[in-house]
């Protein structure tokens, strides 16, 4: 190889080396430039752009920094959606964040907030559907579920009392088992069948005495007299009045006195001719069916029930509270007894412990109108109190049999229990609530 050739090869080698160095220097310069730009993108908040470069050329730490910031932005956007009431979008956004900070908890919070909004808007069925997605132990879930169920219960109750039966059945089915919903659903379905079939015995073809009484009409029925307001509504109450005697057909003039007194209660009232003393359950069933017929014809759903009984009718009255609750789910609000026959000595006619339990569960208040000396010394009353019944002795100054009844009629007692006035507080009455430690009044 000549000297000239060697020089040429050396020059080529040097040129190639310079080119290589220049290339790698340029490449490194570009990388440094791009890295600087990626950092600037990150600093400027373009985490997606920065991550794109870091994914090709950066470190895992750089990528993790971008991922965190991207998740943080998504978290803040989801929080803004939640604050704006966009509950479904916010929940999906939080769920997409997986285990980022408390995103999983916030996703559940979206469910709770949506249920809260639906409950506040009265959309209780939808609220309960939403709440079903929450764990039972989630903070606030049980309380809100109870609130929504109670709201739906009241909606169903309103539809029931207003005799919107198809709607009521739908609402009761949506609610499921809650309080007395099962029995109310059964009664609504029975009412729908009755509405389609009509009543067995119409009560309104023969008005008693052929004239109106106050704001209502007194109708004849084979079991007694039925007073019906001319304008019934969802607030119309119901009352059964059992007379005294040993199941003999007595003059019923003092039943009518309450109506003729001009009070005109918003209540359907059945004045029974007899008290069924010798066949109490059968008589109660007959009374219920007669009252249900009257209610059906006047588009009233039996509720807010009051039952009264004089003398031996007192035994039928107290039994009515347990019977109606057990068989029809009807909670009798008040039972009023007036001078119970034989001073509660007919122990085979009084409530059993099991019946007392039913009346206590129904929340029935027993008001026993008596003269002096009647109270916990009577085994019938003692059993009722011992088994949780709400019993009050109403000690009457006018303690004669008819005096007790007339005072209740003319001094506002029936008005009060039928929602038309205040509880009488005059000197004629002394109210003595009983508990297991009570003694009988002297």
Features from the language model and the residues they span:
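N-terminal Sec-pathway targeting helices
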Residues: 1-17, 21
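Primarily recognizes the serine-hydrolase "nucleophile elbow" in alpha/beta-hydrolase
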Residues: 296, 303-358
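The feature captures the conserved acid-bearing segment of alpha/beta-hydrolase catalytic domains
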Residues: 334, 339-414, 418-421
């Amino acid at each position: 190889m000549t000297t000239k050739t060697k020089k040429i090869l050396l020059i080529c080698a040097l040129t190639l080396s310079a080119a290589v160095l220049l290339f790698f220097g340029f490449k490194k310069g570009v990388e440094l430039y791009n890295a600087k730009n990626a950092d600037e993108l990150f600093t400027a908040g373009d985490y997606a752009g920065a991550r794109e470069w870091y994914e090709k050329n950066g470190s895992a730490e750089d990528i993790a920094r971008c991922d965190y910031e991207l998740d943080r932005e998504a978290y803040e956007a989801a929080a803004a959606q939640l604050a704006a009431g966009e509950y479904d979008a916010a929940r999906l956004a939080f769920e997409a964040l997986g285990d980022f900070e408390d995103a999983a908890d916030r996703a559940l919070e979206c469910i709770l907030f949506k249920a809260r909004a639906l409950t506040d808007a009265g959309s209780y069925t939808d609220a309960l559907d939403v709440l079903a997605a929450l764990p039972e132990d989630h903070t606030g879930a049980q309380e809100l579920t109870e609130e929504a169920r109670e709201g739906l219960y009241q909606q169903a109750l309103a539809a029931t009392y207003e005799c919107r039966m198809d709607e009521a059945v739908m609402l009761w089915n949506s609610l499921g088992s809650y309080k007395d919903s099962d029995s109310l659903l059964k009664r609504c379905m029975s009412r729908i069948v009755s509405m389609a079939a009509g009543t067995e015995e119409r009560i309104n073809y023969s008005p008693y005495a052929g004239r109106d009484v106050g704001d209502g009409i007194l109708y004849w029925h084979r079991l007694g007299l039925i007073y019906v307001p001319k304008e019934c509504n969802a607030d119309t109450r119901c009352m059964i009045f059992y007379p005294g005697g040993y199941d003999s057909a007595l003059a019923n003039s003092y039943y009518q006195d309450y109506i003729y007194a001009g009070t005109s209660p918003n209540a359907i009232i059945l004045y029974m001719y007899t008290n069924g003393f010798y066949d109490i359950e059968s008589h109660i069933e007959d009374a219920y069916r007669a009252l249900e017929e009257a209610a059906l014809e006047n588009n009233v759903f039996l509720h807010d029930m009051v039952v009264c009984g004089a003398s031996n009718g007192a035994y039928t009255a107290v039994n009515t509270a347990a019977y109606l609750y057990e068989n029809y789910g009807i909670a009798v609000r008040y039972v009023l007894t007036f001078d119970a026959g034989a001073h509660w000595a007919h122990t085979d006619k009084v409530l059993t412990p099991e019946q007392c339990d039913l009346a206590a569960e129904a929340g029935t208040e027993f008001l026993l109108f008596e003269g002096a000396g009647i109270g916990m010394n009577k085994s019938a009353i003692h059993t009722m109190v011992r088994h949780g019944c709400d019993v009050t002795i109403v000690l009457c100054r006018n303690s004669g049999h008819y005096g007790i009844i007339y005072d209740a009629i003319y001094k506002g007692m029936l008005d009060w229990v039928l929602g038309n006035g205040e509880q009488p507080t005059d000197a004629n009455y002394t109210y003595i609530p009983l508990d297991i430690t009570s003694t009988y009044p002297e």
